């Protein structure tokens, strides 16, 4: 899935989703001076114009491609993002990086090796962070050095991820969660599909498909695959 992106200008962007996060993605696009922004829905009945952006049905995707649109995911849930990608996997998904995000030396070039990531206002990433595809980093979240973040990870507002952490595919970190430091050769790992509850403090690795909550975080229950 990985792709090596250029720094070409995005002129037209269609965002999958019409929920609140889709509008936050649109905010990122506005900060990047993207001139034409529309939202896409899979609902049969919808208003095609609101006060901010035109809304179209996703059946219009092929027409939008012909018009030169690129695409983004305005969907917070990892599984739904992956579902949409599997349905529309041949589109061009640029990375969206808010102008007020902070990236360490060389980090933008690393991000450009991936696709479909959304980095919102106030996010801070240091350096040598390996980023997968279609991840979201919400307001004021931070990512430390030498982290590995796989596809479809969701990082909610004010999450702090220390250095040498690995987030496996589809992990979801709730608002204000903190992930403590791992080791360069033994990273603290949040397993595939695992959910870390809001304001939780994770001090050690967590297996896949678990819900963990608390400070320190403890396993609350398993998640059905």
Regions found by a protein language model. Name each.
Residues 45-104:
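Phosphate-bearing ligand-interacting subdomains
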Residues 10-29:
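Glycine-rich adenosine-cofactor-binding loop
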Residues 150-151, 156-225:
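Glycine-rich hexapeptide-repeat left-handed beta-helix
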Residues 78-87, 91-147, 151, 159-161, ...:
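Left-handed beta-helix
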Residues 71-74, 119, 213:
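Redox-cofactor binding/interface segments in oxidoreductases and associated redox assembly factors
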Residues 32-49:
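NAD(P)-binding Rossmann-fold cofactor-contacting core
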Residues 2-6:
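N-proximal low-complexity "stem/linker" segments adjacent to membrane-targeting elements
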């Amino acid at each position: 899935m990985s792709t090596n992106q250029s720094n070409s200008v995005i002129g037209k962007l269609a965002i999958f989703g019409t929920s609140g996060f889709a509008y936050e993605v649109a905010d990122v696009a506005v900060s990047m001076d993207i001139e034409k922004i529309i939202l896409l829905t899979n609902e049969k009945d919808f208003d095609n114009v609101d006060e901010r952006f035109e809304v179209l049905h996703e059946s219009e995707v092929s027409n939008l491609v012909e018009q030169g649109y690129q695409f983004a995911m305005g969907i917070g849930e990892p599984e739904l993002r992956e579902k949409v990608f599997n349905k529309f996997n041949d589109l061009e998904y640029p990375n969206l990086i808010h102008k007020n995000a902070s990236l360490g030396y060389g980090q933008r070039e690393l991000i450009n090796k991936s696709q479909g990531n959304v980095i919102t206002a106030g996010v801070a990433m240091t350096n040598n962070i390996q980023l997968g595809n279609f991840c979201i980093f919400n307001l004021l979240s931070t990512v430390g050095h030498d982290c590995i973040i796989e596809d479809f990870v969701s990082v909610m507002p004010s999450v702090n991820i220390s250095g040498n952490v690995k987030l496996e595919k589809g992990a979801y970190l709730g608002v204000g969660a903190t992930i403590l430091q791992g080791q360069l050769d033994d990273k603290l790992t949040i397993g595939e599909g695992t959910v870390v509850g809001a304001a939780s403090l994770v001090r050690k690795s967590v297996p896949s498909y678990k819900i963990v909550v608390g400070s320190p975080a403890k396993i609350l229950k398993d998640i059905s695959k």
